[in-house]
Amino acid sequence: MEKTLTLSVHQLVDFLLRSGDIDNRVFNRSSMTEGSRLHTVYQSQQGSDYLSEYPLQHRFVVGGVDITLQGRADGILKRKNGEYMIDEIKTTVEELEIFRNDNFEWHIGQAKCYAYLFALEQNLDSIGVRLTYIRQGKEKEKRIEDYFFSRSELESYVYALFEDYLAFYNIIFKHIEKKNETIEDLTFPFEKYRRGQRELTKYCYAIAKNGGRFFAEAPTGIGKTMSTLFPYIKASVDDSETKIFYLTAKTSGKEAAYNAIELLKAQGLELNDIVITAKDKVCFCKGCACNPDECPYAKGYYNKIQGVLNYSLMNYTTFDLETITEIAKENEICPFEFELDLSLFCDVIICDYNYMFDPISYMKRYFDEDASHHLALVDEAHNLIDRSRDMYSSTISYQSFLDARKSVRHSKHVRLKRALAKLKKLFDNLTEGLEPGQHILDDYPDELYSVLNYFIETCQDINKNEHQEMTKELLDFYLDVNEFFKLSDFYGDKYILYLDVLAESVNIRLLCLDASSYIARTLRQIKGATLFSATLQPIDYYIDTLGGDKANDPRIILPSPFPINNLRILVAPKVSVRWKDRDKTYKEVGEYIKHFIKNKVGNYFIYSPSYEYMDHLLENIDLEDVDIYVQTKDMREEERETFLLNFMPNPERTTLGFMVIGGAFSEGIDLVSDRLIGAVIIGIGMPRINFESDKIAEFYDSRELPGRDYAYLNPGMNTVMQAVGRVIRSEKDRGAVLLIDERYTWRQYQDLFRAEWKNYQVVLSPEEVEENLAKFFKN
């Protein structure tokens, strides 16, 4: 096997030279963002003989390994005597001398790598290195150190780094060799392909090999997890730099991907895979700040991590939550940082959307570097539209401000008091003379920018130097403000900034109307992406809103692999569940439900348009000899799992689950066989008319697209299709669905019906429902 390795300077020196503790008082998202800004400011102040963000790359052969080392130097200065100097800029909230002394080997190592690359490019015998330190919040405070090296000194230094890195990386080379051998021998893990499965697999293989974006509607039963992962893995053979990101919004999606890989491993595949778990779920020290004074797992993290990675990769290939926490606990290291570092040496990374698409929490280690080898599988892609909008939107709450101010009312910190006073004045100025309601701001106010910036700088200083002043309420508010401030950089024609004025409060809301261009930008960074779901109709709408190109990106809509007659769709158009009519429908809908469940003992879901409607329905429905379980607001994951345990196979009594359409039980639920035999869907799933959706509709209207469809109709019908999809989960399942609303007979809604719904039957009374289903279940 030819051994090749592409490394960024950051990857090399961070792995080998970083030491000490995790400390979010010094290294955090806010300080990184401010650091980027100060980098740009400082670079712009230099003269014409200063080159900023200079790209460097060189190929080396070390111990039989072909290594490409690359990166961007912060600056290159040509001095008057013709000599060159590499400028490495570091900014920090910490005192400069302490920061420099704690991190010198790491910083000078990075600069020396850039210096060597530039010396090779320009054929220089010697070169200078400058370390420029700038204090955040006190930009005039700088520390500049100059060093000079011969090319031979730099060569010895960099080659020594290579040798140290390869001593560790030989584990990975051995793994890659085994992985490639087993991928070559790997065959599809099932005896035969299901209907549509081979077609989906071929498309995915082509995307993984050739690049591009692909959109696929793959209904339940096709086996879309295996049909996407298997060809991606097959296509990645002999490309040691490819990482496959399996992105999903739900725990069930992670479990499906994990189980698919385990099945392939059982057939001989050797592959490193990891499931990334959210920080709040994996943390050992909940409530602690991420610094060595509060969390023992932060202390000495960077001194330990090389050894822990070496042990982990020698002994494991599957890294799930249990394995990660076990290793981290044993070695007393932070499990969250550990799983992120470990992912660098894994082939498949199973994680939430935000690790790729969120502008604040995306994995910079992958997407701030060259990502052109990587592949993405976006599961349940219909969810990414709203999720991405949320990622690029933010809110500052006046109530959160009041809570923060109250929590530090006894503080004597002068600058904090001043920052809070400025915020109070800002809220007063913005809302002066405004009635309750939503008020759009035409421009982003200068005062808003300056006051938020002052507050952030103040909190950064407190967080580092007077941490005892940072109450939970102040920290929570600071994080909200910091997120809002960062996202303000995106403010433009795809945004509105508005005030939501309430009777006793106000929210400042930065709303992203359309995040498709941001999704597209991320997808352009990587080699290939497949975005798939059981519900991607109308397909043009999803390609539009998920950053695709309707004219050029391939798409496919696969038919259901299940017998069409196994699902009975009934439409009850005599009932109007529109907002103005709802109060008159509870008893009538209750009668439809009673007759729907009358013929067959079993498990049924009843989907209501809202919690309020569900409560009134339960008050008005008269049910006997049935067990009833009701979804509650804000159910935790373990509560949802317990809820579903009430719907077991071979029930002796009828069990009803009352829930809200579009909620946790509308998708990602897999109740096979007779664990679920029917669903009643009340209404069309459309969100209630609201200010933000109206603005989204207006945005698309202004671009000559059907705004109401984009903001209301399509998302609503998607929730309905997802809910219907809970009923038939295998080839042997039989079940029925009752759609209650007059609008289901309207053409604009019927145009969105799936192909297997086209044989739906209209029922004009509860008795007709009972009669129809008696024949269906009898047959």
Identify the residue ranges that each predicted region occupies.
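Signature of the SF2 helicase/ATPase Hel1-core->accessory helical subdomain module
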Residues: 228, 255, 331-348, 353-456, ...
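Conserved pre-motif I regulatory segment
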Residues: 175-217, 230
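A substrate-engagement module of RecA-like helicase motors
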Residues: 181, 187, 241-349, 357, ...
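Mg2+/Mn2+-dependent nuclease catalytic core
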Residues: 58-156
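Conserved interdomain hinge at the start of the Helicase C-terminal
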Residues: 521, 573-609
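Metal-dependent nuclease catalytic cores that hydrolyze phosphodiester bonds in DNA/RNA
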Residues: 1-79
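Conserved RecA-like P-loop NTPase helicase motor core
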Residues: 573-584, 632-745
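A contiguous, basic/glycine-rich beta-loop/short-helix subdomain that forms a polymer-engagement track
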Residues: 324-349, 360-367, 461-576, 584-585, ...
